[in-house]
């Protein structure tokens, strides 16, 4: 009977053991410990050395071997193990029950310099790149990515087998409430092939499926060599399935076709139809597809085997990257000089960041199952090789990196290529399945680093982290053990140190710059300072780098922020995260799409000559504008055939849609594509599709282009004061309709006062709609019961003159409750 054990820097052991075992732990000094286990079949001792002190069990090993060889009744198994990423030794012994009487207290001796060097190198060689696999799980919305990822973690004994499914990798509260994946989450799994005994490190990245979070998917694919393309066996290939397939194909990844929810299949014909559809759409061979079910655990083992067999290992140069990672040696020693020559400049891709406040990493650490032993034919589960738990909240930023070349350890001084600034790494580790610190991250690994002094201004997602070499060092294609033909045209690393201390590092190709397509103003709730909202948005933007932010100043609502998003769901999720994670209740203005304009005598078809225009920087044609441009998208709707007629009628008549393609997928489903203004899609087409199809239809949009449009800016004036929060950009022929809705909403919700409140909608200087909120009037003639009518007229005239004086004093002064503004803003999105 064997057990795996680990020891971290504080001397805490994280063990997975049989239920029959009883254990006792004894500490020896700082960070050193020995653990003895006893069972009904005998006693076994596992000994550990702590990190940082250079200890070994040199004196203990001869005692054990001498006793075990002298005992004829003992079964001896001596197997030193170096746990990956931990500065420790783990030794396993199966010895008789009375062995503890002869062992006594182990004598801990310092390692020799040669042993220290060998031990440091073992950190690098414990997981060679050939035994690492990085895989992203991609699919359409609700095709079972998160549920399957959870099943894979439970199969690997990282999560309890009897726990709730489909919840662990969805760490954010908004993800759990909406039932969708918003943030890509990473988890490292250790697997051991039973036939060869080779241990593999598999990094799984669970990605979102909605188009609004495609930026999360693209970043995850950049850190992977393979992609598991999931398809719901009942739903088949859908719009976002193809989008994810092309994204993985663009990154030249190995794509593994996987069918999910096999437990819901009624007959084999349904499976064959989906496999044929997948092969026709993507070209992936149907015989290579893995049939899985997270509910019944079908195909999980086969999927792991496919990942190990078919996904290529990462490429890059392994080795130490910093002199601090080397053991202490004499500065003039030949061995030190030789190790300096073998230094490999660090290159790591930063593809995600978070703070302690804006991540779900502290939520629900998984409890270890009772037994780590998993019995299956070809792949046996690995064990936790790093201790850890829930991270404590602290100042700083966590970064998720993929190490391309070299090694990063705590204390490594890394340089951010984008800003050129240096920052020290305080902690490194893997996510297994929560944050577990390790001693190093080597080439090919995916893990986290913690920077205690880093701020949002210093972070650029997609940046390259590197180390400055201490000598002139150039690494080019073909100099490593990997042939140049396999590396392609991209150099592995290039780092040169000139006499002027300047350096050049070949940056890792980052991510495409994303441009927001939806903008909205965020204003703090009544009684909340703008600084609190700004700080919360800053922290959240660390975890969501696709959001843009600008300062706003509204005379009615006060200071606020204009935020840009990748879609409408993205905006709603961001608002919910502000409330759930930071307690910030905000008033959100109606979403506006990004309009453009070109100056006179400029080509509207040239993207370089387009300039953004909004209500805050609006320019009229007489101010040099040649043409306004409106964003159009291709909306793809996949709907049950019985709902197609109603959806098509609404798209053509109410949302300015133009049908481009209609295709019958099968007997029950129809796919249709429309060319549609993004503004109309924002004003309710998505809701119309969902309500008309009772939630069965799906809608995705992409292919953003700009076309000429006759746009105007419409302002709302209350008591001769412009309300900038209600200003909007719309088509000229729709201005009257939008104005009437807003003015009527204001008239219904505004409280009457002692003076009349004129409500006006203006396009330029022209009033297109006007209403008046009548004032309260006191009955000044209540005490006049008889006499000449002129007595009453005199009172009425005096009252009228008094109200005119009050109106002159109150011009431009109006106080609006946020509920009134919210109702008016809701009227702008009504159809």
Curated annotation (Swiss-Prot):
GO cellular component: mitochondrial inner membrane; mitochondrial matrix
Entries under Pfam families matching the protein: EFG_C, GTP_EFTU, LepA_C
GO molecular function, one term: GTP binding
Membrane topology: Peripheral membrane protein
Matching InterPro entries: EF-4 (IPR006297), EFG_III/V (IPR035647), EFG_V-like (IPR000640), LepA_C_sf (IPR038363), LepA_CTD (IPR013842), LepA_IV (IPR035654), P-loop_NTPase (IPR027417), Small_GTP-bd (IPR005225)
Subcellular location: Mitochondrion inner membrane
Disulphide bridges: none
Sequence similarity: Belongs to the TRAFAC class translation factor GTPase superfamily. Classic translation factor GTPase family. LepA subfamily.
Protein name per Swiss-Prot or TrEMBL: Translation factor GUF1 homolog, mitochondrial
Key words, A-Z: GTP-binding, Hydrolase, Membrane, Mitochondrion, Mitochondrion inner membrane, Nucleotide-binding, Protein biosynthesis, Transit peptide
Domain tr-type G, first and last residues per copy: 130-315
Enzyme Commission (EC) number: 3.6.5.-
Enzyme class, first EC level, given as a word: hydrolase
Transit peptide: 1-68
GO biological process: positive regulation of translation; translation
HAMAP family per record: LepA (MF_00071)
Lineage, uppermost ranks: Eukaryota, Discoba, Euglenozoa, Kinetoplastea, Metakinetoplastina
Catalytic reactions of this protein: GTP + H2O = GDP + phosphate + H(+)
Chain residues that bind GTP: 139-146, 206-210, 260-263
Species annotation: Leishmania braziliensis
Protein purpose: Promotes mitochondrial protein synthesis. May act as a fidelity factor of the translation reaction, by catalyzing a one-codon backward translocation of tRNAs on improperly translocated ribosomes. Binds to mitochondrial ribosomes in a GTP-dependent manner.
């Amino acid at each position: 009977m064997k057990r795996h054990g680990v020891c971290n820097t504080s001397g805490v052991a994280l063990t997975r053991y049989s239920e029959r075992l009883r254990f006792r732990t004894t500490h020896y000094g700082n960070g050193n410990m020995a653990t003895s286990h006893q069972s009904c079949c005998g006693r076994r001792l596992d000994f550990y050395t702590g990190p940082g002190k250079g200890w070994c069990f040199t004196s203990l090993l001869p005692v054990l071997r001498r006793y075990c060889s002298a005992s004829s009744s003992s079964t001896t198994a001596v197997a030193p193990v170096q746990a990956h990423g931990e500065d420790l030794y783990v030794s396993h012994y199966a010895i008789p029950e009375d062995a503890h009487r002869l062992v006594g207290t182990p004598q801990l001796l310092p390692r020799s310099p040669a042993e220290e060097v060998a031990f440091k190198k073992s950190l690098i060689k414990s997981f060679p790149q050939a035994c690492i696999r990085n895989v992203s799980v991609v699919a359409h919305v609700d095709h079972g990515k998160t549920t399957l990822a959870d099943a894979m973690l439970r199969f690997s004994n990282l999560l309890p087998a009897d726990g709730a499914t489909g919840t662990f990798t969805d760490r954010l509260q908004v993800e759990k409430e909406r039932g969708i994946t918003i943030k890509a989450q990473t988890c490292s799994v250790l697997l051991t092939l039973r036939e060869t005994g080779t241990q593999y490190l598999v990094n799984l990245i669970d990605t979102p499926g909605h188009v609004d979070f495609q930026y999360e998917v693209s970043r995850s694919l950049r850190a992977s060599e393979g992609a598991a393309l999931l398809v719901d066996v009942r739903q088949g290939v859908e719009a976002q399935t193809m989008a994810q397939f092309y994204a993985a194909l663009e990154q030249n990844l190995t794509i593994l076709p996987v069918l999910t929810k096999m437990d819901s299949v009624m007959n084999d014909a349904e499976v064959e139809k989906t496999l044929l559809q997948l092969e026709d759409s993507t070209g992936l061979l149907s015989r290579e597809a893995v049939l899985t079910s997270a509910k019944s655990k079908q195909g999980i083992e086969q999927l792991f085997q496919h990942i190990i067999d078919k996904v290529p290992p990462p490429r890059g140069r392994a080795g130490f990257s910093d002199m601090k990672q080397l053991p202490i040696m004499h500065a003039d020693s030949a061995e030190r000089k030789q190790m300096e020559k073998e230094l490999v400049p660090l290159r790591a891709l930063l593809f995600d960041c978070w703070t302690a406040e804006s991540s779900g990493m502290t939520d629900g650490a998984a409890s270890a199952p009772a037994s780590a032993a998993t019995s299956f034919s070809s792949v046996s589960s690995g064990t936790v090789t790093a201790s850890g738990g829930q991270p404590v909240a602290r100042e700083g930023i966590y970064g998720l990196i993929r190490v391309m070349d070299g090694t990063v350890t705590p204390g490594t001084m890394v340089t951010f290529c984008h800003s050129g600034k240096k920052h020290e790494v305080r902690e490194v580790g893997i996510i297994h399945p929560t944050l577990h610190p390790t001693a190093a991250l080597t080439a090919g690994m995916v893990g986290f680093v913690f920077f205690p002094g880093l701020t949002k201004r210093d972070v650029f997602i997609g940046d390259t982290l590197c180390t400055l070499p201490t000598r002139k060092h150039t690494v080019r294609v073909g100099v490593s053990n990997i042939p140049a033909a396999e590396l392609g045209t991209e150099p592995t690393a290039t780092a040169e140190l000139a006499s002027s201390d300047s350096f050049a590092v070949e940056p890792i190709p980052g991510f495409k710059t994303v441009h927001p397509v939806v903008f909205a103003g965020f204003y703090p709730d009544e009684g909340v300072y703008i600084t609190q909202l700004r700080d919360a948005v800053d922290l959240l933007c660390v975890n969501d780098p696709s959001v843009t932010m600008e300062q706003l100043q509204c005379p009615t609502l006060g200071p606020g922020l204009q935020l840009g998003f990748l879609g409408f769901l993205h905006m709603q999720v961001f608002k919910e995260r502000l409330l759930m994670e930071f307690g910030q209740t905000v008033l959100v203005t109606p979403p506006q799409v990004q309009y453009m304009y070109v100056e006179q005598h400029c080509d509207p078809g040239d993207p370089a000559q387009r300039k953004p225009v909004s209500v805050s920087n609006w320019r009229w044609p007489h101010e040099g504008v040649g043409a306004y441009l409106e964003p159009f998208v291709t909306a793809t709707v996949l709907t049950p055939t019985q709902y197609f007629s109603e959806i098509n009628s609404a798209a053509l008549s109410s949302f300015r849609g133009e049908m481009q393609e209609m295709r019958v997928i099968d007997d029950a489903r129809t796919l249709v594509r429309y060319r549609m203004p993004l503004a109309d899609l924002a004003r309710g087409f998505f809701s119309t599709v969902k309500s008309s199809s009772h939630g069965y239809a799906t809608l995705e949009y992409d292919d953003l282009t700009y076309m000429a449009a006759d746009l105007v800016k419409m302002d709302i004036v209350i008591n001769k004061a412009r309300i900038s929060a209600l200003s909007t950009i719309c088509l000229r022929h729709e201005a009257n309709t939008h104005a009437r809705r807003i003015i009527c909403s204001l008239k219904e919700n505004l409280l009457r006062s002692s003076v009349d409140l004129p409500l006006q909608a203006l396009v330029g200087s022209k009033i297109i709609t006007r209403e008046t909120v009548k004032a309260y009037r006191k009955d000044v003639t209540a005490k006049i019961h008889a006499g000449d009518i002129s007595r009453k007229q005199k009172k009425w005239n005096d009252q009228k003159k008094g109200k005119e004086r009050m109106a002159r004093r109150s011009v431009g002064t109006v106080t609006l409750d946020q509920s009134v503004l919210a109702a008016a803003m809701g009227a702008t999105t009504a159809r």
